[in-house]
Amino acid sequence: AAAPGDGPRALADLGGVPKDLVLYQYEVCPFCCKVKAFLDFQGLPYRTVEVHPISKSQLKFSTKYKKVPVLMADGVQCNDSNEIINSLTALLAREGRLRGAPAGGGGLLGAFAGGRGGRGAAPEPSETEARMRRWVDERFARVVTVNIYETLGESFQTFEYITTECPSWGPVERHGARVVGAGLMYVIAKRMKTKYNLGESRAELFACCDEFDKALAGRRFLAGDKAPGNADLCVFGVLRAVVGTDSFREVMVHGKMKPWFLAMEAAVGESSRLSQEAGVPAPAASGA
């Protein structure tokens, strides 16, 4: 198996759809949740490793890249949520295993197919898919982040999972990660609001709901009425990251996102995650 490192090595070089998938993540990171929504919908079994938000010791094998998500796929490292989704889309399409809306009907946003055309080539993105995936990254995820970390109370609410879902971390480590992580994200949210010139946070969030309603244009999904596409999965992942927060509850009563979200829950179904591991040993470094 290929040794992990800072790559990048295209997943397209793999002989087929990878069987051993390990996602290094923060459980509530919107970009990590995009990847998990894709993996769940495609039915690809995967394990997750929770990265400590301060020490990031679980990413010690990645000497240069210290962000999440990082996917190890049959020993090959792939960084960045869009690169992960696009690469796996291409591999699944190549084998004729890609679930989702067909190309041409508001179709699934595909990626390159490793230069190998034919029956298994990934479908080209529709204008709606490409535009909405940019919108998720450049607007929606930022606005959601600013909202859930705008107050220290909601920031602590968001980091509550650390105290219950990272059992292999000691109690002091869990408490420290929650306090420092919540405080750090509170500061980052303030900086993001200034950097991206965002207005009142809830008003921006409701504006995003209205923008989504407009893009949905009466369809069941962004990709059409039959099945969701990758843009749907990305929006769904970002929202699923904040389930249980005040921001999520307010989104569910504003506009048409609730019926779409419920339809997405039904379409995605049960998670294909095999296990969640916190503090497990990272892969051996490649020495490169």
Each language-model region and where it sits:
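Long, positively charged, glycine-interspersed low-complexity recognition regions
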Residues: 236-288
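GST-like fold's C-terminal all-alpha helical module
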Residues: 131, 136-259
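Alpha-helical recognition domains of nuclear gene-regulatory proteins
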Residues: 38, 87, 208-211, 215, ...
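GST-like domain detector, emphasizing the conserved glutathione-binding G-site
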Residues: 1-172, 287
